[in-house]
Regions:
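C-terminal motif of bacterial Sec signal peptides marking the signal peptidase cleavage site
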Residues: 21-23
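Conserved hydrolase catalytic core segment
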Residues: 140-178
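Post-His helix in hydrolase/transferase enzymes
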Residues: 269-281
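Conserved serine/cysteine hydrolase catalytic core
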Residues: 182, 192-263, 268-269
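Conserved HGGG/HGGXW glycine-rich cap/lid loop of the alpha/beta-hydrolase fold
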Residues: 61-113
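Short, low-complexity, disordered segments immediately C-terminal to signal peptides
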Residues: 25-53
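Bacterial N-terminal signal peptides that target proteins for export
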Residues: 2-13
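Active-site loop/oxyanion-hole signature of alpha/beta-hydrolase fold enzymes
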Residues: 105-146
């Protein structure tokens, strides 16, 4: 589900560096306070790590450094994508529950520890960045894709662009391609301007059409959608329209599953247990 980007998560994890340390240690605390500063804040790595090694660095993609943190292991790698207004550190609590599973988190361009660039870019650009990032870091497919909010819609786009690389998808209250069609016609220009005034510089509203064009290419893998049923939906949407469209979306997938949670939109911070359970089930093929 979309939220206005400048609201973001609101209780963002203070340091992205905790992501790798939490996953490696299997540690339990959800509190990121006191985390040590990552060495990637001082230097940018240009040499790809060897296969099977842990990663915690900036990887050069198209001339700029993108932050990537991965833990090795057997089986498909679980790749996490944050929402607009979030960062890779938002997944720390979830990763601490998945220390035995290979995982990767990253910051998109203009986010967190990743480099900044001027101008605007598309969601398709983000997908190509992620594909190049994983290749440069020698993180081989298959992947289980996990995304929150806008990051979830981008993971659907990744699956539609590279279907042979994907074994499963977990969507944590993800923005979905049909949402712009729920907006009243006379408000769409204003909503577009509001959504596109985001700190990432991504064409948020244009991503809806990009994602819709790829829906038919999403592979028939398990897709779990975790819905924060207590969130406040945009007031301009007709009552019940979102829920009906969400059910149609899930029912239209070859292997779709909807899980309703007594939570709002901020599932990575409020429902890490539910996300971790869904990821583990998908990882194990249950």
């Amino acid at each position: 589900m979309r939220h206005i980007p400048d609201q973001g998560i609101g209780r963002m994890v203070a340091s992205t560096a905790i992501v790798l340390s939490a996953a490696c240690s299997g540690g339990g605390s959800d509190d990121a306070s006191g985390a040590s500063e990552s060495p990637t804040q001082q230097a940018s790595a240009s040499v790809a790590p060897s296969a099977g090694a842990a990663v915690d660095e900036l990887v050069q993609v198209k001339g700029r450094g993108l932050y990537l943190a991965c833990t090795p292991g057997d089986g498909p790698t679980v790749v996490f994508s944050h929402g607009v207004g979030g960062q890779s550190g938002d997944w720390a609590a979830t990763l601490s529950r998945l220390a035995d599973i290979p995982t990767c988190v990253y910051d998109r361009v203009n986010v967190g520890l990743s480099d900044k660039e001027a101008g605007r870019h598309s969601a398709t650009d983000d997908i190509e960045d992620l594909h190049a990032l994983l290749a440069a870091a020698e993180i081989e497919p298959p992947y289980v894709l996990v995304g929150h909010s806008f990051g979830g819609m981008e993971m659907l786009m990744y699956a539609g662009t590279y279907p042979e690389d994907v074994e499963g998808i977990v969507l944590a209250d993800a923005t979905l391609p049909f949402e712009s069609q729920l907006d009243p016609l006379d408000q769409r220009a204003e909503i577009r301007a509001e959504l596109n005034a985001n700190p990432e510089g991504v064409d948020f509203y244009g991503a809806y059409a990009e994602a819709r064009a790829l829906l038919g290419s999403i592979p028939g893998v398990p897709v779990t959608y975790l819905f924060g049923a207590q969130q406040v939906l945009p007031p301009e949407w007709e009552e019940g329209a979102y829920e009906a469209a969400l059910h149609r979306f899930i029912d239209g997938l070859p292997d779709g599953r909807l899980v309703e949670l007594a939570a709002d939109h901020d599932l990575p911070l409020d429902e890490p247990d539910a996300i971790a359970e869904a990821v583990r089930r998908t990882f194990l093929g249950e």
